[in-house]
């Protein structure tokens, strides 16, 4: 039997941005970053009210099709609770469709909010599962739920009838590692960027990426001097260069200077993981080319306050 949540119940969620792939770890590696969206949700007597401020405020829907609302309802259904109405206020700082996990953060915020409204009946693993289901892969969502860096994976049932299972394990990132994002002023479609990938790759390229993904994990956790080697990739970035030429140019430029730069998610953001500051002349040049420079820390997990 479902239970109604009392009118006036409120939660505030702060969810970090994320960067996926980290070079070789396609649909597997993710890292949470100190750039946050905030979602405030209150149970009302009836209806749905959605307010949006900040990034995407002019484009995002203000009805039940908003991803945060869909994710809230998904969590409430999983918790077997109901609400009479909702007021949802989104304050977005994560750039939309730039490869910083904006959609995953919205899904995580919604699921975390729904779980908070219900009194936190869902486990961390269930929050990862529900959030990742909106994405179809867990790298971004798991990073935003769990914080730090994650190794994630998807198990597809052999019967073809059950839903995929999304899992993740947290990595404690070495305290010296920072992140700097160079964010272009244009969007990238995840679907369009995925379409350029080949259906088959060579055994040599597959082996190369397996080894570099392992190096990446070692670099993140214990050997940050290996970050450059651990962000090399042959699986997806070379194929995406033609559709993201500005990104590819900056990734190559930075890597040629010894920086561990890579395409963040589906782009177009360029991410650099580093232990020493990036040369200011490079950052100034990026700004002159209309790239937004974000100097970030590794973030902790999504936070939820109920009251």
Curated annotation (Swiss-Prot):
Cell location: Cytoplasm
Domain of life: Bacteria
Keyword Transit peptide: no
GO BP of this protein: threonine biosynthetic process
Gene3D superfamilies, per database record: 3.30.230.10, GHMP kinase, C-terminal domain
Annotated function: Catalyzes the ATP-dependent phosphorylation of L-homoserine to L-homoserine phosphate.
Name of the molecule in the record: Homoserine kinase
Originating species: Corynebacterium aurimucosum (strain ATCC 700975 / DSM 44827 / CIP 107346 / CN-1)
Taxonomic placement: Bacteria, Bacillati, Actinomycetota, Actinomycetes, Mycobacteriales
Gene that specifies this protein: thrB
């Amino acid at each position: 039997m479902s239970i109604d949540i009392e009118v006036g119940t409120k939660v505030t969620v702060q969810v970090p941005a994320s960067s996926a792939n980290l070079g070789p770890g396609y649909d597997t590696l993710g890292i949470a970053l100190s750039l946050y969206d905030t979602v405030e949700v209150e149970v009302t007597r009836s209806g749905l009210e959605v307010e949006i401020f900040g990034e995407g405020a002019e484009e995002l829907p203000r009805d039940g099709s908003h991803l945060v609302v869909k994710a809230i309802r998904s969590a409430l259904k999983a918790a077997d609770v109901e609400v009479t109405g909702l007021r949802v206020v989104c304050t977005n700082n994560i750039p939309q469709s730039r490869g910083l996990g904006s959609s995953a953060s919205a899904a995580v915020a919604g699921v975390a909010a729904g779980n908070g409204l219900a009194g936190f009946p869902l486990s961390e693993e269930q929050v990862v599962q529900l959030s990742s289901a909106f994405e179809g892969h867990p790298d971004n969502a798991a990073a935003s739920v769990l914080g730090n860096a994650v190794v994630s994976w998807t198990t597809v049932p052999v019967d073809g009838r059950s839903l995929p299972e999304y899992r993740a394990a947290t990595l404690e990132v070495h305290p010296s590692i920072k992140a700097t994002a160079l964010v272009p002023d244009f969007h990238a479609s995840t679907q369009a960027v995925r379409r350029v990938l080949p259906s088959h790759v060579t055994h040599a390229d597959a082996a190369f990426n397996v080894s570099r993904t392992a190096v990446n994990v070692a670099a993140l956790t214990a050997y940050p001097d290996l970050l450059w080697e651990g962000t090399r990739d042959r699986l997806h970035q070379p194929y995406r260069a033609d559709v993201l030429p500005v990104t590819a140019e900056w990734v190559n430029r930075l890597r040629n200077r010894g920086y561990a730069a890579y395409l963040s998610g589906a782009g177009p953001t360029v991410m650099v993981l580093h232990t020493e500051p990036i040369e200011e002349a490079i950052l100034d040049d990026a700004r002159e080319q209309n790239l937004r420079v974000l100097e970030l820390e590794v973030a902790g997990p999504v936070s939820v306050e109920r009251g």
